A protein has these predicted regions:
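Hydrophobic mid-bilayer segments of alpha-helices in multi-pass membrane transport proteins
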Residues: 10-21, 35-51, 70-80, 105, ...
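Membrane-interfacial helix-loop connectors
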Residues: 111, 122-135, 140-142, 165-181, ...
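Juxtamembrane and boundary regions of transmembrane helices in multi-pass small-molecule transporters
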Residues: 31, 155-156, 165, 174-222, ...
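Intrinsically disordered, low-complexity non-transmembrane regions of multi-pass membrane transporters
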Residues: 1-20, 45-49, 198-231, 273-291, ...
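Transmembrane alpha-helix boundary signature
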Residues: 49-69, 81-96, 109-122, 308-317, ...
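Interfacial loop-to-helix junctions that mark the boundaries of transmembrane helices
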Residues: 1-10, 31-40, 60-72, 173-183, ...
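Transmembrane helical segments that form the transport core of multi-pass membrane transport proteins
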Residues: 231-356
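Alpha-helical transmembrane segments
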Residues: 65-77, 175-193, 253-268, 332-338, ...
Length: 439
């Protein structure tokens, strides 16, 4: 048993967990819809792994993974999910190219503040309503996925789950803002491409569609404004309630309420949001459901448990894996983030970077951030966040946006259609340019 947890074989449950998440929705969609079935898979792979870890002398590693990573991770996602689920933006304005581009730019900026899921869910319905009279609108949803559900969430650990995990591993809250240049270049290029493309399609619209769009006009209106205050509370809590600011939170024998002070505050903000937001806003206008966050909690229990021995193996054998260039970390993280979940992918490559020898680390120069060379951490962050937009399964909000668009009557591209008609020809060249300039 001890030999298993310290060998490459220990990575099999982790690989099977990620493979199931990636493949099951494609080959057994109806069966996979049930959270009970997801829980079955998580327990089937997670419980035996946990037993092996305990017997193999890695109980401390398992405890750290569950109590130090999993619980804070899920509580943050719960807070963002509930609070943003209490904000509703409605209205129908003219779907001119500059209006659509403004919507996408707003979501791109908000993604770093309220998370990619929050920004996407806040804006996707107003975008679809605004464009309902237009015939050509698939491209708007595709760029929405790229900008609002992925690329925008780079500047804070709230933006995308992999960034929060790297924050828990020692990267400072403000460090993520240092990636503003690739964030700005990527967003600026995608917005410029979108504006040109939307202008082209707008000029191709039949005059009846344009006329209908001009006639049907409803001013924008925001419901649940109090939740913006709770959202500010989340940002301040993550930024200032941590061991870096309050050293007692990191002490081994500190009281539980001190260790989990951040989580206690986040849960309090979550409850305030839930009980002070009108049910009509949350459940009728936003069609709020607990199912998505339950799904995340269930799947990530399996991911975090099976990931424990895999991370230990990668860290111990990092020097022999042959990753010795920044671009290799960028594209390796990006490739796996495209088809697997980007959070465990980012954590795995952080473990690889942390396991490099001192001489290997010195070759990258610069400061160490979260225990790894800064340029490698940037490569991992950029690869995880940006490449999540390469497929529908690269990041959680992608499928949610696709489903809402299809409910509105938009015929979205297939899994491979999305890649060959959009991500490979539009996104990948931009990502390559980012690597050439910054990495």
């Amino acid at each position: 048993m001890e030999q298993f947890v310290h060998s490459a074989w220990s990575m099999i449950p982790f690989g099977l967990m990620l493979l199931t998440i990636a493949v099951a929705p494609l080959i057994a969609e109806h069966w996979w819809e049930s959270n009970r079935h997801k829980l079955t898979v998580a327990l089937f792979l997670g419980v035996p792994t946990a037993i092996c870890l305990i017997v193999g002398g890695m109980l401390h590693d398992l405890e750290h993974q569950i109590f130090g990573d999993y619980i804070p991770f899920i509580i943050l996602l719960l807070a963002l999910y509930v609070i943003t689920g209490g904000i509703h933006l409605s209205g129908d304005i003219k779907a001119k190219p500059w209006v659509n581009t403004t919507f996408l730019a707003l979501g791109w900026v908000l993604a770093s503040i309220m998370g990619t899921t929050g920004a996407a869910m806040l804006l996707i319905r107003p975008v679809l309503t605004t464009n309902q009279q237009r015939e050509h609108k698939v491209h708007t949803v595709l760029f929405f996925i790229a900008l609002c559900a992925n690329c925008g969430g780079l500047l804070t650990p709230l933006g995308d789950p992999p960034l929060f995990m790297l924050f828990l591993r020692g990267a400072e809250f403000t460090w993520f803002a240092s990636m503003w240049a690739p964030w700005l270049l990527t967003g600026g290029l995608l917005l410029a491409i979108y504006f040109a493309l939307d202008t082209y399609y707008y000029n191709k619209e039949h005059w009846t569609a344009i006329s209908a769009d001009h006639r049907e006009h409803t001013p924008l209106r925001i419901y649940g404004k109090l939740n913006f205050l709770y959202l500010v509370g989340v940002v301040l809590t993550v930024a200032f309630v941590n061991a870096g600011v309050i050293p007692q939170m990191g002490e081994e024998h500190a009281p539980m309420w001190i260790k989990y002070l951040r989580e206690i505050i986040l849960v309090s903000l979550t409850l305030l949001s839930f009980y002070t937001t009108k049910k009509k806003v949350r459940f009728e206008l936003n069609k709020f459901s607990w199912a998505p966050i339950v799904e995340v909690a269930v799947l990530f229990f399996g991911i975090f448990t099976t990931m424990t021995p895999a991370l230990a193996y990668l860290n111990a054998n990092a020097a022999s894996l042959g990753l010795d260039a920044t671009w290799q970390f960028y594209y390796s993280t990006g490739l796996l983030s495209s088809f697997l979940d980007n959070t465990p992918t980012a954590v795995a490559f952080h473990s690889v970077a942390a396991g490099l020898t001192p001489d290997q680390m010195a070759a990258f120069g610069g400061n160490l951030v979260a225990g790894v060379p800064e340029v490698l951490l940037q490569a991992i962050c950029l690869g995880a966040v940006f490449f999540g937009a390469m497929t529908y399964i690269g990041n959680g909000p992608n499928f949610m946006v696709k489903a809402i668009a299809e409910e509105s009557g938009i015929k979205m591209p297939s899994f491979f259609g999305y890649m060959f008609r959009f991500s490979l020809i539009v996104l990948l060249p931009v990502y390559i340019l980012v690597q050439l300039i910054f990495l």
